[in-house]
A protein has these predicted regions:
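Composition-driven recognition of low-complexity segments enriched
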Residues: 1-180
Length: 180
């Protein structure tokens, strides 16, 4: 549990804060009283905590990262939230560059733009954006819970913030992130 929290802090600038405080024993940690041996194999509870962590960390950091100047961003220094997949080749190239950066930054995986994992991640992003655009009644602002900057909901007219949140959640659930 401590290693996961340190990794999140190193990558996102602050700890998630849930594993060490509320879920330490469930995530295989010890308390030096009733539990003195760490779990060596992943459990179902650990998998559930990993899903919660990926969703929550992504929720807290994607919109906030886009609110910064590009030079200060950890996650998205090479793309803006209004860059939409399929709109033109330049847009797709920017998105692919951002995905390559995320793979390297979060997974320590150095892949080219034409790597199958990069393409899979691009398709995930493009599908989320396209599906949201097709559906009627989806708010053009980011969610209440995830999409606030200074207490105000952020506009997300192209659904790209939600798409990027999906991508970060997906990457945080990869074994390369969880079990390095």
């Amino acid at each position: 549990p401590e290693q996961l929290e340190r990794k999140i802090e190193a990558l996102f600038g602050k700890r998630w804060g849930q594993v060490e405080s509320k879920m330490k024993i469930l995530y295989g940690g010890i308390n030096s009283k009733s539990v003195t041996e760490r779990l060596t194999e992943p459990s179902g509870a650990m998998g559930a905590i990993q899903r919660i962590m990926a969703n929550d960390v992504s929720c807290r950091h994607v919109t906030a990262d886009f609110a910064l100047e590009p030079a200060k961003r950890r996650l998205f220094p090479h793309v803006e939230k209004d860059v939409v997949p399929g709109s033109d080749p330049t847009a797709d190239a920017k998105i692919l560059k951002a995905i390559v950066h995320l793979h390297e930054y979060l997974l320590d995986s150095r892949e080219n733009i034409d790597h199958p994992e990069v393409e899979r991640t691009f398709q995930l992003f493009a599908t989320v954006v396209a599906e949201a655009k097709k559906r009627k009644g989806i708010d053009k602002r980011d969610t209440y819970h995830c999409g606030r900057i200074d207490g105000k909901r952020v506009d997300d007219p192209h659904y790209t913030l939600r798409g990027w949140r999906t991508v970060v959640t997906y990457l945080l659930r990869q074994p390369e992130f969880l079990y390095e």
